[in-house]
Amino acid sequence: MENAVKRIGVLTSGGDAPGMNAAIRSVVRSALSRGIEVVGIRRGWQGLINGDFMQMDSSSVSRIINRGGTILYTARSEEFRTKEGQEKAANTCKLLGLDGIVAIGGDGTFRGAQDLSKWGISVVGIPGTIDNDIVCTDYTIGFDTAANTAVECIDRLRDTMQSHERCSVVEVMGRRAGYLALYVGLAVGATAVLVPETEYDFEAHVAEKIRQARLMGKTNYMIVVAEGCVSAMKVGDQIREKLGLDPRVTILGHIQRGGSPTAKDRVIATRMGYEAVRVLAEGGTNRVIVTRSDQIVDMDIDEGLAMMKTLNQEEFQVMKIMTGQ
């Protein structure tokens, strides 16, 4: 079966995440070790539609394992959501002689992989998003780096907030999921952590926590907010109006996506890239590479996207204890 796969493509789609380059590097070198050619598709699914590609060899991916972002660029494609766009992408695969595609990205990327596989193209997905919100995997490439970046920024903010005895409200990314906020909040010892999985209640989740901290003798407070829960600006305004404090609001934004990936992200990305090539070489399609209890395995994309993911309840319980909930 392996000899049937002669040429594959690799692309990154959706939001970038630290470690994507490590995954690209692994895909290229793993494929070459099997005698499989690799084509890099630039700018995600739109690049596949447009035939925007580059031939890749081992030197193409030299010295990129430590780089953030993605050397293949990334983009979102409205055209690929249409049947006409998907047909164009499938035709490009055939014109380029591709026997399969490795797609690196989030849940939107995986839905694109689902769609493309219906046109007879073998596709394997690798989860890459700082949100860690893909239902079928314990871990997504980029999460550890983003969390460490957020922690470093908040630690720096806390230094100045302590000096001025102020309250700080920090908004982190995560879209509709609170994994990043929860993890970061635990790491920085936040006064309160607001996540979209819990309905926002200012009095219970913020005001009471600040009052408790005051009783403990604290004079500065750190509120970590997931972007999908409530606006950090709104929280800041409520603190000012109802508690009489003068909070400083910081939205970390896209800085969380950048920077050199951590060792964890580099290693997991490398292992996932290797596994994706193995699955394609053995005839797999419509598959996604996932982590389960520190093991790298593959599963059906349809089954993976149908799963429901909730916050880590153990971490959530620890957070509640740490913040006095």
Predicted regions and their residues:
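Glycine-rich oxoanion-binding loops at beta->alpha junctions
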Residues: M1-E2, L48-I101, G108-T109, I141-N148, ...
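N-terminal phosphate-binding or glycine-rich loops at protein starts, especially the Walker A/P-loop
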Residues: E2-I49
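Short, ordered loop/turn segments at secondary-structure junctions
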Residues: S13-D16, I41-G47, R76-S77, G106-G108, ...
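Short Gly/Thr/Asp-enriched flexible loops that form oxyanion-binding sites at enzyme active sites
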Residues: A22-V27, G108-I121, A181
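Glycine/threonine-rich beta-strand-loop-alpha-helix active-site module
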Residues: R29-M56, W119-R156
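Accessory alpha-helical/coil subdomains and C-terminal extensions
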Residues: A103-G105, D115, S122, F143-D246, ...
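C-terminal non-catalytic interaction/assembly regions of soluble proteins
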Residues: S231, I239-Q325
